[in-house]
Amino acid sequence: VEHRKFLCPAPGYDRHFAITEHFGFELIPIAMHDDGPDMDAVEAYAADPTVKGIWCVPKYQNPTGIIFSDAVIRRFAALRPAAEDFRIFWDNAYCIHDFDADTPKIPDLLALCEAAGNPDLVYEFCSTSKISFPGAGISAVAASPANLIDIKGFLKFATIGPDKLNQLRHARFFKNSAGLAAQMQKHAALLCPKFEAVYGALHEELDGTGV
């Protein structure tokens, strides 16, 4: 397809934009609101068959920290793109990166897409890179059975197989979702005081300056 386009909520993650630009897509910026991307614009652009997908970080979106609302996520699930191969690239990198228990939980887009008759609309992925080892964690992808067949078809040429020892290390260390949650609380205990110190210094030095 000539003149392929990809939707890029902006501001957003530069690596996402670089990937699609490298593969020859025209990048279309989508404005971000307090509850997520401008869905009127997303729906309008999705009516163009040359638009092939959209990048999304639904929780703590780079760099603003926005969390997509339930309403926005449900509109994503209900999309009827003109291109049959349109895909939502749902980068749920920060799905468990919460400092406290009051953080809103976002709906399961994959389940919503299936319920809406759009099972193949989304690729959801994440990793432990910001939980265990930056650049050396393990990754995960969730998608429909048909999409997983496609993904495996590409991966078998990209790699012989995953680092199974690294997978074993992670499985033995974290054990389950409770283990992951406990690790994130340890991160929070280290990071929260640092953020509070920075915020305090900024307020002390800059309040009233008009900056």
Where are these regions (language model features)?
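Structural signal for well-ordered, non-membrane alpha-helices
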Residues: F17, C192-F195, Y199, H203
